[in-house]
From Swiss-Prot:
The gene is fusA. SUPFAM superfamilies: EF-G C-terminal domain-like, P-loop containing nucleoside triphosphate hydrolases, Ribosomal protein S5 domain 2-like, Translation proteins. CDD domains: EF-G, EFG_III, EFG_mtEFG1_IV, EFG_mtEFG_C, EFG_mtEFG_II. InterPro entries: EF-G-like_DII, EFG_II, EFG_III, EFG_III/V, EFG_IV, EFG_V, EFG_V-like, G_TR_CS. One of its GO terms (biological process) is ribosome disassembly. Keywords: Cytoplasm, Elongation factor, GTP-binding, Nucleotide-binding, Protein biosynthesis. Coiled coil: none annotated. The keyword Ligase does not apply. The keyword Nucleotide-binding applies. This is Elongation factor G. It comes from Geobacillus thermodenitrificans (strain NG80-2). Residues 8-282 form the tr-type G domain.
């Protein structure tokens, strides 16, 4: 099957936003207008096409990023709908990694919200060009220019309107195009009857003003345009469009569109914007990777005749076809039934079937081409972040970094039958979601699951029940504390056993020093003259890493320390890797007395939005939770309080906020950093853990 759409006419985009800004509804409308869906699905009715997991339809939020493909004006647009809830940040992170551009959806009343800041930061990290869609223009309190201002104030983004709304709230009837300098009027609620008209007289001056501002903003980024502008020459529509496209692709400029997806207004013009301003796979730099054996850096051009390379960005278990691996093809082509190399794991994999996904309905295809996003059936070894490539041209593309989980709960199967199925369910869920971990506590024998927040774990337990038919009891949440050292010290670890038969001998001197917060564990071998033979050094490092899993204070993992192996001794006959491993772990235990170990706890960045009259109560409540208020601002007639609060104090906060504000307050939180636990609280935690 030949290529249906050229690379120039392909767009790989994501739709990202704060929860409830209307991402899924926007995607639904895109699918409706591109002829993919015959009846529009509504999120609040639980029938949206992209929200295809049962839990999503019940909760009205998007959890997994469903990938779908649509066609518009001779272009193929591959869309990934990403969740806006902070607990699912990893889904956003992994879809951004494989996208070429994105639409950021804002709520016209709220503008930029906390989760918008998080996803915006992530998109900036990956250098993803964006256009902005100010949605919900029909909502009470909708204010387009306020929303644009929040882009400048909160994100320092060089964002300018390429459209203006005609009216707002229930008077929102049309849109002015500031590039073409014309207007569009909507005649009905399905938004299909759209008429191109002259700009209404009473909007003429405003349109001229913002047209001028747009040209000025774009000219600043384009020398040729700047010269014409300064010399007073007329800038044509084509020149303006080309300059906006160039600046957007260079991530220097963000065009802002407006509309109401729910009322079907502005979506077709937004699709035009995707085609006009977001990059094709050819417009962005070729992806770079490393040749495994030589560590040499290479580029993989987005061409069908280049060697095949792709990145697996999502694993899903499908009830009908089993394990689905979603991947983005960066170069070359791939046929179903062929073999590829998973260069990350050095395993050969056979591609069973290739599927193009449309939310949850699938179409089988025989070949995928450079720039495509598709799913494969039959990959056994591949997990999220792995590179798939041509067997003769190995390359490893940059993988993805995932945050460590910050919350854990113990779960117990309700019956013996559940116990057998639970292990399998947890394994499959871990394959799908790299921020979800499950392990058995060696001391209590309990199964502990860890994730990014309470909602994340709720949904995991829910999925176990529905998809894997596992009933489980869930314990109270536990915080992922860590331990670290405050002081430096030189410590000895000696393991000697010589009683009949072959003995054991391992002896090390290690200098422990505190490392910067967040830098993790660093090991240095400073042995001179072979007092500890080279072959035992890795055993010393492994012994330390193992011992660090159970800290000296309260059994929590030890982080952010440096260990320098500088002396020791060995025995020709009795020394072994095992002996040195044990000696190293003894050194770590001995360090407890000298290095002043302390407990660390996760601190969450919290943003609470409340009516002004509750401000005093909420501030008092945050302080009582050991929180530090970092700032406040008015947003419309509400107050926004930003604070840093220990995670341990945030359990059940949703309920308490509801009762404190008669249900009128909302909050969001995201993990920020680890900080030392105050001594009186640390003592209690240590006591509890030692069962005193």
């Amino acid at each position: 099957m030949a290529r249906e759409f050229s690379l120039e006419n392909t767009r790989n985009i994501g739709i990202m936003a704060h929860i409830d800004a209307g991402k899924t509804t926007t995607t639904e409308r895109i699918l409706f207008y591109t002829g993919r869906v015959h009846k529009i699905g509504e999120t609040h009715e639980g029938s949206a096409t992209m929200d295809w997991m049962e839990q999503e339809q019940e909760r009205g939020i998007t959890i997994t990023s469903a990938a779908t493909t649509a066609q518009w004006k001779g272009h193929r647009i591959n869309i990934i709908d990403t969740p806006g809830h902070v607990d699912f940040t990893v889904e956003v992170e992994r879809s951004l990694r494989v996208l070429d551009g994105a639409i950021t959806v804002l709520d016209a009343q709220s503008g930029v919200e906390p989760q918008t800041e998080t996803v915006w930061r992530q998109a900036t990290t990956y250098g993803v060009p964006r256009i902005v869609f100010v949605n919900k223009m029909d909502k009470i309190g909708a204010d387009f220019l306020y929303a644009v201002k929040t882009l400048h104030d909160r994100l320092q983004a060089n964002a300018y309107p390429v459209q203006l709304p005609i009216g707002a709230e229930d008077q929102f009837t049309g849109i002015i195009d500031l590039v073409e300098m014309c207007a569009y009027h909507y005649h009905d609620d399905l938004g299909k009857n759209i008429e191109r008209i002259e700009i209404p007289e009473d909007y003429r001056d405003l349109a001229e003003e913002y047209h001028g501002k747009l040209i000025e903003a774009v000219a600043e980024l384009d020398e040729e345009l700047m010269m014409k502008y300064l010399e007073g020459e007329e800038i044509t529509k084509e020149e303006l469009k080309a300059a906006i496209r160039k600046a957007t692709i260079n991530v220097e400029f963000y065009p802002v569109f407006c509309g109401s997806a729910f009322k079907n207004k502005g979506v077709q013009l937004l699709l035009d914007g995707v085609v006009d301003y977001l990059p094709s796979p050819l417009d962005i730099p070729a992806i770079r990777g490393i040749i495994p054996d030589t560590e040499e850096e290479v580029a993989r051009e987005a061409r069908d005749d280049a060697p095949f390379s792709a990145l697996a960005f999502k694993i899903m278990t499908d009830p009908y076809v089993g394990k689905l691996t979603f991947f983005r093809v960066y170069s070359g082509t791939l046929d179903s039934g062929s073999y590829v190399m998973n260069s990350t794991k050095r395993k050969r994999e056979r591609i069973g079937r290739l599927l193009q996904m449309h939310a949850n309905h699938r179409q089988e295809i025989s070949t995928v081409y450079a720039g495509d996003i598709a799913a494969a059936v039959g990959l056994k070894e591949t997990t999220t972040g792995d590179t798939l490539c041509d067997e003769k041209n190995l390359v490893i593309l940059e993988s993805m970094q995932f945050p460590e989980p910050v919350i854990s709960v113990a779960i117990e199967p309700k019956s013996k039958a559940d116990q057998d199925k639970m292990g399998q369910a947890l394994q499959k869920l871990q394959e799908e979601d790299p921020t979800f971990r499950a392990h058995t506590d060696p001391e209590t024998g309990q199964t502990i699951i860890s994730g990014m927040g309470e909602l994340h774990l709720d949904i995991i337990v829910d999925r176990m029940r529905r998809e894997f038919k596992v009933e489980a009891n869930v314990g109270a949440p536990q915080v992922a504390y860590r331990e670290t050292f405050r002081q430096s010290a030189q410590v000895e670890g000696k393991f000697i056993r010589q009683s009949g038969g072959r003995g054991q001998y391992g002896h090390v001197w290690i200098e422990f020093t505190p490392n910067e917060r967040g830098k993790g564990f660093e090991f240095e071998n400073a042995i001179v003259g072979g007092v500890v033979p080279k072959e035992y050094v890795p055993a010393v490092q492994a012994g330390l890493e193992e011992a660090m899993q159970n800290g000296v204070l309260a059994g929590y993992p030890v982080v952010d320390i440096k260990a320098k192996l500088f002396d020791g001794s060995y025995h020709d006959v009795d020394s072994s890797e095992m002996a040195f491993k044990i000696a190293a772990s003894m050194a770590l235990k001995n360090a407890a007395a000298k290095c002043e170990p302390v407990l660390l706890e996760p601190i969450m960045k919290v943003e609470v939005v409340i009516p002004e009259e509750y401000l005093g109560d909420i501030m008092g409540d945050i302080t009582s939770r050991r929180g530090r208020v970092e700032g406040m601002e008015a947003r419309g007639n509400a107050q926004v309080v930003r604070a840093m609060v220990p995670m341990a104090e945030m359990f059940g906060y949703a309920t308490s906020l509801r009762s404190n504000t008669q249900g009128r307050g909302t909050f969001s939180m995201v993990f920020d950093h680890y900080e030392e636990v105050p001594k009186n609280i640390a003592d209690e935690i240590i006591k509890k853990n030692k069962g005193e």
